[in-house]
Structures are given as C-alpha cells and as structure tokens.
C-alpha cells in the first residue's frame, strides 16, 4: 500500500516538474519575443558619422571621410549586417525599389559593409546596385554595437522575415560575421543632420520605405551660397 502511495506521490511530483518546466519554457519564449531584452540603440550624432573612415573597394582603395557621401545632396545609406545573408539581400532589394524615385530627387543610395570576405560583396551587388564601401572599424554599426545571437532563433519576427525572404526567392550563405546588427540612415546635406535612423532590432528587420521617402523629401541640396555660409 505504501508502495502505491509512494508511486502516486512520485508521479505527481514528476507531473508538477513537467508542468513547471513547460511553463518556464513558455514564459521564456514569450519574453524572448518582446523587446524587453533587446539592447536599445544609441542614436548616432552627425558629428560621429561625419568622421567615419570609409574605403573604396577598388584594387587600390581610397580612404575618405563618410561625410563626402552626403555633403552636397544628402544620402540614403544601408549598413549591411552580412552581404551573404539572404535576409540582408532581401532588405537590399527592398531598398533598391526606391532607386528610381531617389534618382528623380537627386539623392544617392549607398551601402557600407564591415568586412570583405571572398566574393561576398560582388555576390551582393545584384541585390544592391548602388556604390558599396568598407567600414573596417564598424562605426556605422555603433556608436554602441548591438548583437543578436541565439535569441534570433526563437523570435517569431525573425521566422516571419525568413519566410518572407525565402518566399521572395532569396538565398544566401553563412560566410562572414553576422551577429552585429545593421540599419539604414537618411542623412541631409551639409549640416542638415540625420533625418531617419533605422536600427535593426532583429534579423531581417526592414526599414519602412514610406518613412525613407518622407525623410528624403526633407533633404535640401547644398547650393554654392549655402556652402559658403
């Protein structure tokens, strides 16, 4: 009789542990899909961005200050998380859909990458047809770099973004560093400042294209008179 009581008590104990473990896992999954544990991006001041050193990707690279990109006409700049990532390729293609309108407004579209691995940049160019530059010190990914690692595997937004990119026919590889999150900037001409700063909160977090266009329309191209003032 005592054996049956012990067995029943043991079964109830194991059932309670199982329910508790399931509840803890469900709570962890729920919390992982909120923004509670995501690192908050630090806004990049114009002065910080202006002083970033970029390199061209030619055989004989030229180093220049990033402000050259937007000084006259402003610019839209994509900080690419990883060129070989199919999510990044989908983001780039999405942004490229604005190229005709940007050309009409006279605003250039650029991308920066944090490393040049094998042919990753060349293989990225079919999705992004603007000029691409190297940001070796990863300054466009700061001032405080944010990473997403294992949490990305359990976030529903990442799975949705992945499905959307896969359904769109995008594919990729695992070459290069892909944990440091990227973003998109719209920067006005001269000292007009940062008009839009989109920081990825998770893998495949695309910028709102209407927000990009709204910000671009605020750019005031520099004239000889405004450059002298």
UniProtKB/Swiss-Prot annotation:
InterPro entries: PXL2A/B/C, Thioredoxin-like_sf. Belongs to the peroxiredoxin-like PRXL2 family. PRXL2A subfamily. Residues 14-112 are annotated as: Thioredoxin fold. The keyword Secreted applies. It holds the Pfam family AhpC-TSA_2. One of its GO terms (cellular component) is extracellular region. This is Peroxiredoxin-like 2A. Keywords: Antioxidant, Cytoplasm, Redox-active center, Secreted. Involved in redox regulation of the cell. Acts as an antioxidant. Inhibits TNFSF11-induced NFKB1 and JUN activation and osteoclast differentiation. May affect bone resorption and help to maintain bone mass. Acts as a negative regulator of macrophage-mediated inflammation by inhibiting macrophage production of inflammatory cytokines, probably through suppression of the MAPK signaling pathway. One of its GO terms (molecular function) is antioxidant activity. Induction: Up-regulated on CSF1 treatment. Expressed by the principal cells of the epididymis. Detected in the head region of epididymal sperm (at protein level). Expressed in bone marrow. Disulfide bonds: none annotated. Signal peptide: none annotated. It comes from Rattus norvegicus (Rat). The active site is at residues 85, 88. The gene is Prxl2a.
